Design a protein with these regions (language model features):
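Residues in well-ordered beta-strands of folded domains
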Residues: 111, 142, 171
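Active-site/ligand-binding-proximal alpha/beta "capping" segment
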Residues: 148-154, 158-161
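Thiamine diphosphate
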Residues: 1-133, 138, 146, 155
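Flexible, glycine/charged-enriched surface loops at secondary-structure junctions
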Residues: 165-171
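Arginine/glycine-rich "motif VI" loop of SF2 helicases in the C-terminal RecA-like domain
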Residues: 103, 162-164
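Conserved small/polar residues in nucleotide/adenosyl-binding loops
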Residues: 174-176
Length: 176
């Protein structure tokens, strides 16, 4: 049996690892608690880390979450395997582009650290308010309950979107 490599990581690092391996482009705009995913991917790209396709991931940091979703849509239209990372209000700003992406059957994965929607004051507690607002967009959803599930189901999301051409929201509350 081959030697297994065990690492200790949080859900953000697990999702970022899989996203990096399965993506050619990552459109990012950091928003807590999903910021570490984008930071990991940006760092690995700068270090020249190779993905499953033998290339480094092209990282585009955008001016807003809406811009990141627009960049994802454009990149997908050009034929690149693309992903993004977001949470909370950031995900809500991506909804208009999500309808376009799903309607055009463009395969992609949005990795979401599910978080409470803030109303009058900042709230960083985890819940599913943000992703439930996206139910009607046409994106399939996978939800994880542990870091191991994040690692496993992130790969499932990337493979399933390629096979089905249905975009996925890969969500978890495991960001701490």
């Amino acid at each position: 049996m081959a030697n297994k490599k065990f690492i200790t990581c949080d859900g953000n690092q697990a999702a970022a690892h899989i996203a990096y391996m399965f993506s050619e482009v990552a459109a990012i705009y950091p928003i807590t608690p999903s910021s570490p995913m984008a930071e990991h991917v940006d760092e690995w790209s700068a270090q020249g880390r190779i993905n499953l396709f033998g290339d480094t991931v092209k990282v585009q940091e955008m001016q807003s979450e809406g811009g990141a979703a627009g960049a994802v849509h454009g990149s997908l239209q050009a034929g690149a395997l693309t992903t993004t990372f977001t949470a909370s209000q950031g995900l809500l700003l991506m909804i208009p582009n999500m309808y376009k992406i799903a309607g055009e059957l463009l395969p992609c994965v949005f990795h979401v650290s599910a978080r409470t929607l803030a109303s009058h004051s900042l709230c960083i507690f985890g819940d599913h308010q943000d992703v439930m607002a996206c139910r009607q967009t046409g994106f399939a959803m996978l939800c994880e309950g542990s870091v191991q599930e994040v690692m496993d189901l992130s790969a499932v999301a990337h493979l399933a979107t390629l096979e089905s051409r249905v975009p996925f929201i890969n969500l978890s509350l495991i960001h701490i």
